[in-house]
Protein backbone atom coordinates (compact mmCIF):
# COMPACT_ATOMS: atom_id res chain seq x y z
CA UNK A 1 0.00 0.00 0.00
CA UNK A 2 2.81 2.42 0.80
CA UNK A 3 4.10 2.14 -2.79
CA UNK A 4 1.19 4.21 -4.14
CA UNK A 5 2.30 7.84 -4.32
CA UNK A 6 -0.17 9.52 -6.65
CA UNK A 7 -3.72 8.45 -7.48
CA UNK A 8 -6.16 9.81 -10.06
CA UNK A 9 -9.69 9.37 -8.75
CA UNK A 10 -12.80 9.43 -10.95
CA UNK A 11 -14.59 12.07 -8.90
CA UNK A 12 -18.22 13.18 -9.01
CA UNK A 13 -18.51 15.09 -5.75
CA UNK A 14 -21.11 12.65 -4.51
CA UNK A 15 -21.10 10.83 -1.22
CA UNK A 16 -18.93 7.90 -2.31
CA UNK A 17 -16.11 9.82 -3.94
CA UNK A 18 -16.13 12.49 -1.22
CA UNK A 19 -15.37 9.74 1.29
CA UNK A 20 -12.81 8.08 -0.96
CA UNK A 21 -10.41 11.05 -0.93
CA UNK A 22 -9.69 11.01 2.83
CA UNK A 23 -9.82 7.21 2.85
CA UNK A 24 -7.09 7.05 0.20
CA UNK A 25 -4.85 9.43 2.13
CA UNK A 26 -5.31 7.43 5.31
CA UNK A 27 -4.95 4.02 3.70
CA UNK A 28 -2.08 4.70 1.31
CA UNK A 29 0.32 6.63 3.54
CA UNK A 30 -0.80 10.16 2.70
CA UNK A 31 -0.56 9.69 -1.07
CA UNK A 32 -1.41 12.57 -3.38
CA UNK A 33 -4.96 12.54 -4.74
CA UNK A 34 -5.77 14.03 -8.13
CA UNK A 35 -9.53 14.39 -8.63
CA UNK A 36 -10.76 13.88 -12.17
CA UNK A 37 -14.25 14.72 -13.36
CA UNK A 38 -15.58 13.99 -16.84
CA UNK A 39 -18.20 16.38 -18.15
CA UNK A 40 -20.33 14.05 -20.27
CA UNK A 41 -23.37 16.28 -20.17
CA UNK A 42 -24.64 15.43 -16.70
CA UNK A 43 -25.63 19.09 -16.27
CA UNK A 44 -23.81 22.30 -15.42
CA UNK A 45 -25.33 22.31 -11.93
CA UNK A 46 -23.45 19.09 -11.15
CA UNK A 47 -20.12 20.83 -11.81
CA UNK A 48 -20.70 23.98 -9.76
CA UNK A 49 -18.25 24.13 -6.87
CA UNK A 50 -16.84 20.72 -7.73
CA UNK A 51 -13.18 21.78 -7.73
CA UNK A 52 -13.52 23.58 -4.40
CA UNK A 53 -15.25 20.55 -2.91
CA UNK A 54 -12.53 18.18 -4.11
CA UNK A 55 -9.76 20.35 -2.68
CA UNK A 56 -11.63 20.75 0.62
CA UNK A 57 -11.89 16.96 0.86
CA UNK A 58 -8.13 16.58 0.51
CA UNK A 59 -7.36 16.44 -3.21
CA UNK A 60 -4.34 18.41 -4.41
CA UNK A 61 -5.79 19.08 -7.88
CA UNK A 62 -9.09 18.74 -9.72
CA UNK A 63 -9.23 18.25 -13.48
CA UNK A 64 -12.64 18.80 -15.10
CA UNK A 65 -12.52 17.64 -18.72
CA UNK A 66 -15.23 18.58 -21.23
CA UNK A 67 -16.10 15.41 -23.15
CA UNK A 68 -19.66 16.21 -24.22
CA UNK A 69 -19.18 16.56 -27.98
CA UNK A 70 -16.75 13.64 -28.18
CA UNK A 71 -19.09 11.47 -26.14
CA UNK A 72 -22.03 12.03 -28.47
CA UNK A 73 -20.06 11.97 -31.72
CA UNK A 74 -17.67 9.07 -31.10
CA UNK A 75 -19.57 6.85 -28.66
CA UNK A 76 -23.33 7.47 -28.74
CA UNK A 77 -23.76 7.90 -32.49
CA UNK A 78 -21.73 4.81 -33.50
CA UNK A 79 -23.53 2.71 -30.89
CA UNK A 80 -26.95 3.81 -32.08
CA UNK A 81 -25.93 3.31 -35.73
CA UNK A 82 -25.23 -0.33 -34.87
CA UNK A 83 -28.77 -0.81 -33.58
CA UNK A 84 -27.55 -1.69 -30.09
CA UNK A 85 -30.28 -2.13 -27.45
CA UNK A 86 -29.71 -4.22 -24.32
CA UNK A 87 -32.36 -6.86 -23.63
CA UNK A 88 -34.77 -5.18 -26.01
CA UNK A 89 -35.23 -1.98 -24.01
CA UNK A 90 -32.14 -0.38 -22.45
CA UNK A 91 -30.36 2.14 -24.68
CA UNK A 92 -27.04 1.71 -22.82
CA UNK A 93 -26.83 5.22 -21.37
CA UNK A 94 -24.55 4.39 -18.46
CA UNK A 95 -22.53 1.73 -20.28
CA UNK A 96 -21.69 3.99 -23.26
CA UNK A 97 -20.22 6.68 -21.00
CA UNK A 98 -17.75 4.45 -19.18
CA UNK A 99 -15.11 3.97 -21.91
CA UNK A 100 -14.71 7.68 -22.67
CA UNK A 101 -14.52 8.50 -18.95
CA UNK A 102 -11.95 5.76 -18.38
CA UNK A 103 -9.90 6.88 -21.37
CA UNK A 104 -9.80 10.49 -20.19
CA UNK A 105 -8.95 9.38 -16.65
CA UNK A 106 -6.01 7.37 -17.95
CA UNK A 107 -4.84 10.35 -20.02
CA UNK A 108 -4.83 12.55 -16.91
CA UNK A 109 -3.00 9.87 -14.93
CA UNK A 110 -0.26 9.57 -17.53
CA UNK A 111 0.02 13.35 -17.80
CA UNK A 112 0.50 13.91 -14.06
CA UNK A 113 2.69 10.84 -13.55
CA UNK A 114 0.29 8.92 -11.34
CA UNK A 115 0.93 5.31 -10.42
CA UNK A 116 -2.67 4.35 -9.63
CA UNK A 117 -6.26 4.83 -10.74
CA UNK A 118 -9.27 4.79 -8.45
CA UNK A 119 -13.03 4.56 -8.97
CA UNK A 120 -16.06 4.58 -6.69
CA UNK A 121 -17.95 1.66 -8.22
CA UNK A 122 -19.46 -0.91 -5.90
CA UNK A 123 -18.41 -4.54 -5.88
CA UNK A 124 -21.90 -5.58 -6.99
CA UNK A 125 -22.26 -3.65 -10.21
CA UNK A 126 -21.25 -3.60 -13.85
CA UNK A 127 -19.28 -0.36 -13.71
CA UNK A 128 -16.31 -1.85 -11.86
CA UNK A 129 -15.91 -4.28 -14.77
CA UNK A 130 -16.30 -1.56 -17.38
CA UNK A 131 -13.80 0.81 -15.83
CA UNK A 132 -11.19 -1.78 -14.99
CA UNK A 133 -11.44 -3.51 -18.37
CA UNK A 134 -10.76 -0.15 -20.01
CA UNK A 135 -7.89 0.55 -17.62
CA UNK A 136 -6.38 -2.85 -18.42
CA UNK A 137 -6.56 -2.16 -22.15
CA UNK A 138 -5.18 1.39 -21.97
CA UNK A 139 -2.70 1.41 -19.08
CA UNK A 140 -2.12 -2.05 -17.60
CA UNK A 141 0.92 -0.77 -15.72
CA UNK A 142 -1.22 1.40 -13.43
CA UNK A 143 -2.52 -0.03 -10.18
CA UNK A 144 -6.29 0.03 -9.71
CA UNK A 145 -7.87 0.86 -6.36
CA UNK A 146 -11.53 -0.03 -5.75
CA UNK A 147 -12.43 1.18 -2.23
CA UNK A 148 -15.83 -0.52 -2.13
CA UNK A 149 -14.01 -3.84 -2.39
CA UNK A 150 -11.54 -2.89 0.34
CA UNK A 151 -13.02 -0.72 3.06
CA UNK A 152 -15.32 -1.88 5.83
CA UNK A 153 -18.07 0.66 5.21
CA UNK A 154 -21.25 -0.92 3.89
CA UNK A 155 -23.94 1.77 3.69
CA UNK A 156 -24.68 5.43 3.01
CA UNK A 157 -25.01 5.92 6.74
CA UNK A 158 -21.48 4.58 7.25
CA UNK A 159 -20.12 7.03 4.68
CA UNK A 160 -21.99 9.96 6.22
CA UNK A 161 -20.59 9.10 9.65
CA UNK A 162 -17.10 8.76 8.17
CA UNK A 163 -17.25 12.25 6.63
CA UNK A 164 -18.80 13.79 9.74
CA UNK A 165 -15.97 12.44 11.88
CA UNK A 166 -13.51 14.25 9.61
CA UNK A 167 -15.53 17.48 9.36
CA UNK A 168 -15.95 17.12 5.60
CA UNK A 169 -19.18 18.69 4.36
CA UNK A 170 -21.52 16.88 1.98
CA UNK A 171 -24.95 17.61 0.56
CA UNK A 172 -25.82 13.92 0.69
CA UNK A 173 -28.15 12.54 3.33
CA UNK A 174 -29.62 9.23 4.38
CA UNK A 175 -32.98 10.35 2.99
CA UNK A 176 -31.67 10.69 -0.58
CA UNK A 177 -32.41 7.09 -1.35
CA UNK A 178 -32.00 6.85 -5.11
CA UNK A 179 -28.73 6.13 -6.87
CA UNK A 180 -28.66 8.22 -10.05
CA UNK A 181 -26.29 8.51 -12.98
CA UNK A 182 -26.76 11.21 -15.61
CA UNK A 183 -25.14 12.19 -18.88
CA UNK A 184 -26.16 13.81 -22.16
CA UNK A 185 -27.94 10.64 -23.27
CA UNK A 186 -29.95 9.67 -20.20
CA UNK A 187 -30.42 9.51 -16.47
CA UNK A 188 -30.75 6.27 -14.51
CA UNK A 189 -32.50 5.69 -11.19
CA UNK A 190 -31.86 2.71 -8.92
CA UNK A 191 -32.32 1.80 -5.28
CA UNK A 192 -34.94 2.72 -2.69
CA UNK A 193 -38.44 1.49 -3.47
CA UNK A 194 -37.25 0.23 -6.87
CA UNK A 195 -35.40 -2.65 -5.22
CA UNK A 196 -38.77 -4.39 -4.83
CA UNK A 197 -40.06 -5.18 -8.36
CA UNK A 198 -43.63 -5.23 -7.03
CA UNK A 199 -43.39 -1.50 -6.26
CA UNK A 200 -44.41 0.79 -9.07
CA UNK A 201 -42.03 3.76 -9.39
CA UNK A 202 -43.39 6.82 -7.62
CA UNK A 203 -43.60 10.18 -9.35
CA UNK A 204 -40.51 11.24 -7.40
CA UNK A 205 -38.35 8.71 -9.25
CA UNK A 206 -38.55 10.49 -12.59
CA UNK A 207 -36.63 13.75 -12.90
CA UNK A 208 -36.06 14.42 -16.60
CA UNK A 209 -39.35 13.71 -18.35
CA UNK A 210 -42.90 14.94 -17.85
CA UNK A 211 -45.38 12.33 -16.66
CA UNK A 212 -47.03 11.11 -19.88
CA UNK A 213 -50.43 11.60 -18.25
CA UNK A 214 -49.58 15.28 -17.74
CA UNK A 215 -48.00 15.76 -21.17
CA UNK A 216 -49.65 18.10 -23.71
CA UNK A 217 -52.92 16.92 -25.24
CA UNK A 218 -51.67 18.00 -28.65
CA UNK A 219 -48.92 15.99 -30.39
CA UNK A 220 -45.72 17.60 -31.64
CA UNK A 221 -44.02 16.73 -34.93
CA UNK A 222 -40.34 17.04 -35.80
CA UNK A 223 -38.61 16.53 -39.12
CA UNK A 224 -35.29 14.79 -38.55
CA UNK A 225 -32.61 14.58 -41.22
CA UNK A 226 -30.29 11.58 -41.09
CA UNK A 227 -26.94 11.06 -42.82
CA UNK A 228 -24.93 7.87 -42.39
CA UNK A 229 -27.19 6.88 -39.48
CA UNK A 230 -26.48 10.16 -37.68
CA UNK A 231 -28.95 12.95 -36.94
CA UNK A 232 -27.62 16.07 -38.66
CA UNK A 233 -30.60 18.44 -38.66
CA UNK A 234 -33.93 19.00 -36.93
CA UNK A 235 -36.70 20.96 -38.65
CA UNK A 236 -34.25 22.16 -41.27
CA UNK A 237 -31.66 23.47 -38.81
CA UNK A 238 -28.25 21.80 -39.03
CA UNK A 239 -26.87 20.90 -35.61
CA UNK A 240 -23.76 19.37 -34.08
CA UNK A 241 -24.24 15.89 -32.61
CA UNK A 242 -24.40 17.26 -29.07
CA UNK A 243 -26.73 20.15 -29.92
CA UNK A 244 -29.05 17.82 -31.84
CA UNK A 245 -29.28 15.52 -28.83
CA UNK A 246 -29.91 18.43 -26.45
CA UNK A 247 -32.73 19.74 -28.62
CA UNK A 248 -34.35 16.33 -28.93
CA UNK A 249 -33.98 15.80 -25.17
CA UNK A 250 -35.87 19.02 -24.51
CA UNK A 251 -38.62 18.34 -27.04
CA UNK A 252 -39.15 14.69 -26.14
CA UNK A 253 -38.99 15.17 -22.36
CA UNK A 254 -41.87 17.65 -22.58
CA UNK A 255 -44.03 14.84 -24.01
CA UNK A 256 -42.94 12.17 -21.52
CA UNK A 257 -41.02 10.22 -24.15
CA UNK A 258 -38.21 7.85 -23.19
CA UNK A 259 -39.18 6.25 -19.88
CA UNK A 260 -38.41 2.57 -19.28
CA UNK A 261 -38.60 0.45 -16.14
CA UNK A 262 -36.64 -2.78 -16.54
CA UNK A 263 -35.11 -5.62 -14.59
CA UNK A 264 -31.88 -6.46 -16.36
CA UNK A 265 -29.20 -9.13 -16.13
CA UNK A 266 -25.96 -7.65 -14.85
CA UNK A 267 -22.60 -8.91 -16.04
CA UNK A 268 -21.80 -10.00 -12.47
CA UNK A 269 -24.71 -12.46 -12.52
CA UNK A 270 -27.43 -10.81 -10.47
CA UNK A 271 -30.54 -9.07 -11.71
CA UNK A 272 -31.09 -5.39 -11.00
CA UNK A 273 -33.94 -3.02 -11.55
CA UNK A 274 -33.50 0.39 -13.09
CA UNK A 275 -35.70 3.20 -14.30
CA UNK A 276 -34.14 5.01 -17.24
CA UNK A 277 -35.07 8.25 -18.97
CA UNK A 278 -33.70 8.65 -22.50
CA UNK A 279 -35.97 11.17 -24.22
CA UNK A 280 -33.88 12.43 -27.13
CA UNK A 281 -32.26 9.06 -27.66
CA UNK A 282 -35.62 7.36 -27.98
CA UNK A 283 -36.60 9.81 -30.72
CA UNK A 284 -33.27 9.28 -32.49
CA UNK A 285 -33.71 5.52 -32.46
CA UNK A 286 -37.22 5.84 -33.90
CA UNK A 287 -35.89 8.02 -36.71
CA UNK A 288 -33.00 5.67 -37.52
CA UNK A 289 -35.29 2.65 -37.55
CA UNK A 290 -37.64 4.47 -39.88
CA UNK A 291 -34.88 4.98 -42.46
CA UNK A 292 -33.44 1.51 -41.86
CA UNK A 293 -36.77 -0.05 -42.84
CA UNK A 294 -36.58 1.68 -46.22
CA UNK A 295 -32.97 1.11 -47.22
CA UNK A 296 -31.91 -2.35 -46.03
CA UNK A 297 -33.09 -5.60 -47.57
CA UNK A 298 -33.85 -8.68 -45.48
CA UNK A 299 -30.29 -10.12 -45.36
CA UNK A 300 -28.84 -6.70 -44.50
CA UNK A 301 -31.33 -6.14 -41.70
CA UNK A 302 -30.66 -9.61 -40.35
CA UNK A 303 -26.93 -8.91 -40.38
CA UNK A 304 -27.45 -5.48 -38.81
CA UNK A 305 -29.47 -7.11 -36.02
CA UNK A 306 -26.66 -9.61 -35.40
CA UNK A 307 -24.01 -6.90 -35.37
CA UNK A 308 -26.20 -4.78 -33.11
CA UNK A 309 -26.63 -7.58 -30.59
CA UNK A 310 -22.92 -8.34 -30.51
CA UNK A 311 -22.14 -4.65 -30.11
CA UNK A 312 -24.77 -4.33 -27.38
CA UNK A 313 -23.05 -6.93 -25.22
CA UNK A 314 -19.62 -5.52 -26.01
CA UNK A 315 -20.67 -2.08 -24.74
CA UNK A 316 -22.62 -3.42 -21.77
CA UNK A 317 -19.77 -5.66 -20.66
CA UNK A 318 -17.07 -2.98 -20.97
CA UNK A 319 -15.08 -4.22 -23.98
CA UNK A 320 -14.86 -1.00 -25.99
CA UNK A 321 -11.07 -0.97 -26.32
CA UNK A 322 -10.75 -4.35 -28.01
CA UNK A 323 -10.16 -5.55 -31.59
CA UNK A 324 -13.73 -6.87 -31.62
CA UNK A 325 -15.06 -3.35 -31.15
CA UNK A 326 -13.22 -2.14 -34.24
CA UNK A 327 -14.51 -5.08 -36.27
CA UNK A 328 -18.12 -4.56 -35.25
CA UNK A 329 -17.94 -0.82 -35.84
CA UNK A 330 -16.56 -1.44 -39.33
CA UNK A 331 -19.45 -3.79 -40.11
CA UNK A 332 -21.95 -1.33 -38.71
CA UNK A 333 -20.56 1.62 -40.63
CA UNK A 334 -20.69 -0.35 -43.89
CA UNK A 335 -24.46 -0.55 -43.45
CA UNK A 336 -24.83 2.95 -42.00
CA UNK A 337 -23.68 4.59 -45.24
CA UNK A 338 -27.11 3.88 -46.75
CA UNK A 339 -29.09 5.20 -43.77
CA UNK A 340 -29.84 8.62 -45.23
CA UNK A 341 -33.09 10.52 -45.46
CA UNK A 342 -35.76 12.38 -43.54
CA UNK A 343 -38.25 11.19 -40.95
CA UNK A 344 -41.21 13.03 -39.44
CA UNK A 345 -41.69 11.80 -35.88
CA UNK A 346 -44.77 12.29 -33.75
CA UNK A 347 -44.39 12.71 -29.98
CA UNK A 348 -47.50 12.28 -27.88
CA UNK A 349 -48.18 11.18 -24.30
CA UNK A 350 -44.98 9.19 -23.79
CA UNK A 351 -44.87 7.68 -27.28
CA UNK A 352 -42.85 8.47 -30.39
CA UNK A 353 -43.64 7.11 -33.84
CA UNK A 354 -42.11 7.61 -37.26
CA UNK A 355 -45.08 8.98 -39.20
CA UNK A 356 -43.38 9.82 -42.51
CA UNK A 357 -40.07 8.73 -44.00
CA UNK A 358 -38.14 9.02 -47.24
CA UNK A 359 -34.64 8.20 -48.42
CA UNK A 360 -32.62 8.57 -51.64
CA UNK A 361 -31.41 5.01 -50.94
CA UNK A 362 -34.89 3.56 -50.44
CA UNK A 363 -35.55 0.04 -51.73
CA UNK A 364 -39.27 0.55 -51.36
CA UNK A 365 -41.06 0.84 -54.71
CA UNK A 366 -44.69 1.82 -54.80
CA UNK A 367 -44.89 0.40 -58.32
CA UNK A 368 -44.01 -3.08 -57.05
CA UNK A 369 -45.78 -2.92 -53.69
CA UNK A 370 -49.13 -1.52 -54.83
CA UNK A 371 -52.34 -3.51 -54.36
CA UNK A 372 -53.71 -1.76 -57.43
CA UNK A 373 -52.90 -2.27 -61.09
CA UNK A 374 -49.22 -2.44 -62.00
CA UNK A 375 -47.13 -3.19 -65.05
CA UNK A 376 -43.88 -4.24 -63.36
CA UNK A 377 -44.68 -7.34 -61.31
CA UNK A 378 -45.88 -10.58 -62.88
CA UNK A 379 -47.66 -12.45 -60.11
CA UNK A 380 -47.39 -15.73 -62.03
CA UNK A 381 -43.65 -15.71 -61.35
CA UNK A 382 -44.36 -16.39 -57.67
CA UNK A 383 -45.50 -19.96 -58.41
CA UNK A 384 -42.08 -21.26 -59.41
CA UNK A 385 -40.41 -19.48 -56.51
CA UNK A 386 -42.84 -21.00 -54.01
CA UNK A 387 -42.30 -24.53 -55.38
CA UNK A 388 -38.55 -24.18 -54.92
CA UNK A 389 -38.84 -22.39 -51.58
CA UNK A 390 -41.05 -25.15 -50.16
CA UNK A 391 -39.23 -28.05 -51.84
CA UNK A 392 -37.66 -29.41 -48.65
CA UNK A 393 -41.06 -29.50 -46.93
CA UNK A 394 -42.55 -31.30 -49.92
CA UNK A 395 -39.77 -33.92 -49.97
CA UNK A 396 -39.99 -34.46 -46.21
CA UNK A 397 -43.69 -35.21 -46.36
CA UNK A 398 -43.37 -37.44 -49.45
CA UNK A 399 -40.61 -39.46 -47.74
CA UNK A 400 -42.76 -39.92 -44.63
CA UNK A 401 -45.46 -41.56 -46.76
CA UNK A 402 -43.19 -44.17 -48.34
Swiss-Prot record:
<protein>
    <recommendedName>
        <fullName>Argininosuccinate synthase</fullName>
        <ecNumber>6.3.4.5</ecNumber>
    </recommendedName>
</protein>
<dbReference type="InterPro" id="IPR001518">
    <property type="entry name" value="Arginosuc_synth"/>
</dbReference>
<feature type="binding site">
    <location>
        <position position="126"/>
    </location>
    <ligand>
        <name>L-aspartate</name>
    </ligand>
</feature>
<dbReference type="GO" id="GO:0005737">
    <property type="term" value="C:cytoplasm"/>
</dbReference>
<dbReference type="Pfam" id="PF00764">
    <property type="entry name" value="Arginosuc_synth"/>
</dbReference>
<keyword id="KW-0963">Cytoplasm</keyword>
<feature type="binding site">
    <location>
        <position position="179"/>
    </location>
    <ligand>
        <name>L-citrulline</name>
    </ligand>
</feature>
<feature type="binding site">
    <location>
        <position position="127"/>
    </location>
    <ligand>
        <name>L-aspartate</name>
    </ligand>
</feature>
<dbReference type="InterPro" id="IPR023434">
    <property type="entry name" value="Arginosuc_synth_type_1_subfam"/>
</dbReference>
<feature type="binding site">
    <location>
        <begin position="10"/>
        <end position="18"/>
    </location>
    <ligand>
        <name>ATP</name>
    </ligand>
</feature>
<feature type="binding site">
    <location>
        <position position="122"/>
    </location>
    <ligand>
        <name>L-aspartate</name>
    </ligand>
</feature>
<dbReference type="GO" id="GO:0000053">
    <property type="term" value="P:argininosuccinate metabolic process"/>
</dbReference>
<dbReference type="InterPro" id="IPR048268">
    <property type="entry name" value="Arginosuc_syn_C"/>
</dbReference>
<feature type="binding site">
    <location>
        <position position="264"/>
    </location>
    <ligand>
        <name>L-citrulline</name>
    </ligand>
</feature>
<feature type="binding site">
    <location>
        <position position="188"/>
    </location>
    <ligand>
        <name>L-citrulline</name>
    </ligand>
</feature>
<dbReference type="GO" id="GO:0006526">
    <property type="term" value="P:L-arginine biosynthetic process"/>
</dbReference>
<comment type="pathway">
    <text>Amino-acid biosynthesis; L-arginine biosynthesis; L-arginine from L-ornithine and carbamoyl phosphate: step 2/3.</text>
</comment>
<keyword id="KW-0055">Arginine biosynthesis</keyword>
<feature type="binding site">
    <location>
        <position position="276"/>
    </location>
    <ligand>
        <name>L-citrulline</name>
    </ligand>
</feature>
<dbReference type="GO" id="GO:0004055">
    <property type="term" value="F:argininosuccinate synthase activity"/>
</dbReference>
<comment type="subunit">
    <text>Homotetramer.</text>
</comment>
<feature type="binding site">
    <location>
        <position position="126"/>
    </location>
    <ligand>
        <name>L-citrulline</name>
    </ligand>
</feature>
<feature type="binding site">
    <location>
        <position position="38"/>
    </location>
    <ligand>
        <name>ATP</name>
    </ligand>
</feature>
<comment type="similarity">
    <text>Belongs to the argininosuccinate synthase family. Type 1 subfamily.</text>
</comment>
<feature type="binding site">
    <location>
        <position position="130"/>
    </location>
    <ligand>
        <name>L-citrulline</name>
    </ligand>
</feature>
<dbReference type="GO" id="GO:0005524">
    <property type="term" value="F:ATP binding"/>
</dbReference>
<dbReference type="Pfam" id="PF20979">
    <property type="entry name" value="Arginosuc_syn_C"/>
</dbReference>
<dbReference type="InterPro" id="IPR048267">
    <property type="entry name" value="Arginosuc_syn_N"/>
</dbReference>
<keyword id="KW-0067">ATP-binding</keyword>
<feature type="binding site">
    <location>
        <position position="90"/>
    </location>
    <ligand>
        <name>L-citrulline</name>
    </ligand>
</feature>
<dbReference type="GO" id="GO:0000050">
    <property type="term" value="P:urea cycle"/>
</dbReference>
<dbReference type="InterPro" id="IPR014729">
    <property type="entry name" value="Rossmann-like_a/b/a_fold"/>
</dbReference>
<dbReference type="InterPro" id="IPR018223">
    <property type="entry name" value="Arginosuc_synth_CS"/>
</dbReference>
<feature type="binding site">
    <location>
        <position position="120"/>
    </location>
    <ligand>
        <name>ATP</name>
    </ligand>
</feature>
<dbReference type="InterPro" id="IPR024074">
    <property type="entry name" value="AS_cat/multimer_dom_body"/>
</dbReference>
<keyword id="KW-0547">Nucleotide-binding</keyword>
<keyword id="KW-0436">Ligase</keyword>
<keyword id="KW-0028">Amino-acid biosynthesis</keyword>
Amino acid sequence: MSKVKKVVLAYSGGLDTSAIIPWLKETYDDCEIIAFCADVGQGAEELVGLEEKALASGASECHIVDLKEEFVKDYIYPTMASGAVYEGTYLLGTAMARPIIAKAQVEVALKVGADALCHGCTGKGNDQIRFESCFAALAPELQVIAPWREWEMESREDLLDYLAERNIETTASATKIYSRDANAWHISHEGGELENPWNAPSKGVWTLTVDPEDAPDKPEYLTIKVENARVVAVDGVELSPYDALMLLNEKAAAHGVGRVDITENRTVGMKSRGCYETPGGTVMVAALRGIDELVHDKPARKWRDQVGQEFTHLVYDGRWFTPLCGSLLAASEALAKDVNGEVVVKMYKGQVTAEQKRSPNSLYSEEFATFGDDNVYNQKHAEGFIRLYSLSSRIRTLNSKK
